[in-house]
From Swiss-Prot:
It comes from the Archaea. To M.jannaschii MJ0361. This is Uncharacterized protein MJ0944. Coiled coil: none annotated. InterPro entries: Tscrpt_reg_PadR_N, WH-like_DNA-bd_sf, WH_DNA-bd_sf.
Amino acid sequence: MLIGILSKKYVKEILELLNEKGELHFSQIHKEIPTHMSSLNRTLNELVKLGLISKRKEDNKQALPKTYYKLTPLGKKALLLYEVEKIIENSKNNQNIIIQIINGKNHNIINAKIVNIHNK
């Protein structure tokens, strides 16, 4: 389930890292994410299974091939949910929130407008 995985520890950081840096191999991700290798591997595999990131192996004739991970278009959309969460958490109880998500070919934008109920 998408919401379930997005609430797991380090998922937001992994998605943001891949969004910022592009394709990274496992050890590059591990340098940035302070968790056990087995936990990171499990989380990355869950993200791959849900289609939020893609995975490819590069066989460079060494003992172990490097595994690379990259954010998918669905993963970029999932990052928008963190923005929506932030907007909702920062709103006051007596206000309605109007959220417009624009997902164009080359951009993702969230416009949020907080409207006071009493002014309607």
